[in-house]
């Protein structure tokens, strides 16, 4: 939906049609047995016909050039978490904290200024710092393609979101999810006051 809307101006009264058409595409892509088109018409209270949904589906696919797979923050996060865990002992707390930070970033419009890989690497750096671990390494630079200096602004933005989450009443679902023992209660962890400048210039 987001990719289509970033390319095409859509009137408000067509948003629901775009939404169900994108759900249809996603279900065909992800599910073994995709729901019938009539089911998508039904959830719109039959506001749209089968033909309208199919026409809109074609428009979305044509606009995206049938390119449906785009790397996300999570795609890179998995790779960088493995790279970090290959060097120093890390438990699930690290993985869950990095994932929680990534979810906070997904909900903040200001983070659209950064590439998904940039955000993922910054989430790893901040999570390592918050857990008192070495923040970066040659291995992480190799697998991420970023140096600490290149991550500074994005990492500070990630840290600010983590800090803000301690007092903000927004995003209760993410905080509740990661406050569960299943996720090591990472959303309840204390947040450091700031990210010191020296971690972005370790050679200095």
What are these regions (language model features)?
Residues 1-20, 24-204:
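Acidic, serine/threonine-rich low-complexity regulatory regions at protein termini
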């Amino acid at each position: 939906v987001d990719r289509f809307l970033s390319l095409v101006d859509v009137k408000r009264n067509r948003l629901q049609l775009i939404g169900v058409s994108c759900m249809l595409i996603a279900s065909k892509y992800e599910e073994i047995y995709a729901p019938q088109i009539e089911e998508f018409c039904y959830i719109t209270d039959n506001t749209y016909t089968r033909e309208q949904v199919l026409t809109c589906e074609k428009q979305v696919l044509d606009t995206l050039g049938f390119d449906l797979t785009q790397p996300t923050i999570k795609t890179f996060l998995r790779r960088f978490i493995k790279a970090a865990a290959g060097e120093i002992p890390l438990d699930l707390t690290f993985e869950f904290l990095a994932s929680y930070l990534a979810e906070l970033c997904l909900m903040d419009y200001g983070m659209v200024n950064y590439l998904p890989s940039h955000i993922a690497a910054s989430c790893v750096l901040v999570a390592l710092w918050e857990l008192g671990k070495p923040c970066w390494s040659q291995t992480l630079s190799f697998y991420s393609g970023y140096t600490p200096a290149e991550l500074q602004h994005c990492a500070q933005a990630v840290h600010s979101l983590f800090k803000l989450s301690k007092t903000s009443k927004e995003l209760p679902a993410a905080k509740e999810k990661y406050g569960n023992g299943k996720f090591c209660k990472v959303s309840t962890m204390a947040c450091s006051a700031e990210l010191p400048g020296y971690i972005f210039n370790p050679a200095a």
